[in-house]
């Protein structure tokens, strides 16, 4: 994997920094594991905008990723690594001994020809998936289940990982990249290692158009709007009317807590670093 800084042959290329991975498959993805991925433009069934700054972008197929890893005891060979436009991590196409193919999140160090496995008897090796109760304390894991059988929900993006720091009865304690320490049911599964493509954070898109290719539209500041459009709108010159920063719907935007699910607070041992 290499970090390439483009030559300034045009204003749009001057600031581009690309991540080039020669190990990624250059052909088409595996068709049986593709699904249609329709764009909504941020509109709901009434045609009204419910998510701002969404629209346009390149057409994409959704890759069906195996987040549950339930084929226990059947080894699988990594056929190739692929780019996935729907996530920051790369994905791996694996071929099981019974002939089935699935996509999984590609962990750091995984390459074509490697063998991965899932189940309680799987060895502690990058890419193998086991219940948390069978993984040694101190291990680094990713693709962690919060609810057993639901599929991985934690540490799925490029470079993400969690560390098992304690085991207590039916729960294990994880330290996340954010610094948060959280209890998770030990019956839930996790994959050994950290997610690959950690250099993803170093890329620079270089121009506004590259953001538009990804389906992201421009953001207009509230103070540049009219009073009918935003609480900060109107006034002569740039003035917010002396009001603390709020969203278009009047919700404070800096330091205001919006977490609603208080029932799971008991699982958080320590809040994230700020």
From Swiss-Prot:
GO terms for cellular component: large ribosomal subunit. Keywords: Ribonucleoprotein, Ribosomal protein, RNA-binding, rRNA-binding. Coiled coil: none annotated. It comes from the Bacteria. GO terms for biological process: cytoplasmic translation. GO terms for molecular function: rRNA binding; structural constituent of ribosome; transferase activity. Residues 223-274 are annotated as: Disordered. One of the primary rRNA binding proteins. Required for association of the 30S and 50S subunits to form the 70S ribosome, for tRNA binding and peptide bond formation. It has been suggested to have peptidyltransferase activity; this is somewhat controversial. Makes several contacts with the 16S rRNA in the 70S ribosome. Part of the 50S ribosomal subunit. Forms a bridge to the 30S subunit in the 70S ribosome. Belongs to the universal ribosomal protein uL2 family. PANTHER family: LARGE RIBOSOMAL SUBUNIT PROTEIN UL2M, RIBOSOMAL PROTEIN L2. This is Large ribosomal subunit protein uL2. It comes from Aliivibrio salmonicida (strain LFI1238). The gene is rplB.
């Amino acid at each position: 994997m290499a970090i390439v800084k483009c030559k300034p042959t045009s204003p749009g290329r001057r600031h581009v920094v690309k991540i080039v991975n020669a190990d990624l498959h250059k052909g088409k993805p595996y068709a049986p594991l593709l699904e249609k991925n329709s764009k909504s433009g941020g509109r709901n069934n009434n045609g009204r905008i419910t998510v701002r700054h969404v629209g346009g972008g390149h057409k994409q197929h959704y890759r069906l990723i195996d987040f549950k890893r339930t084929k226990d005891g059947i080894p699988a060979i990594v056929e190739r690594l692929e780019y996935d436009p729907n996530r920051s991590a790369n994905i791996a196409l694996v071929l099981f001994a019974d002939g089935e193919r699935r996509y999984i999140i590609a962990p750091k160090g995984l390459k074509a020809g490697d063998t991965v496995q899932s189940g309680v008897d799987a060895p502690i090796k990058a890419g193998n998936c086991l219940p948390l109760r069978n993984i040694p304390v101190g291990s680094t894991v990713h693709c962690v289940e919060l609810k057993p059988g639901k599929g991985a929900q934690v540490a799925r993006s490029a470079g993400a990982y969690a560390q098992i720091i304690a085991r207590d009865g039916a729960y294990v304690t994880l330290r996340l990249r954010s610094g948060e320490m959280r209890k998770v049911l030990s019956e839930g599964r996790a994959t050994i290692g950290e997610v690959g493509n950690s250099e993803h954070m170093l890329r620079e898109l270089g121009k506004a158009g590259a953001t538009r290719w990804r389906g992201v539209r421009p953001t207009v500041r509230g103070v540049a709007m009219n009073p009918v459009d935003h609480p900060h709108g109107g006034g002569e010159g740039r003035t917010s009317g002396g009001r603390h920063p709020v969203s278009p719907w009047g919700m404070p935007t800096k330091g205001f807590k919006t977490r609603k699910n208080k029932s799971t607070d008991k699982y958080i041992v320590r809040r994230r670093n700020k």
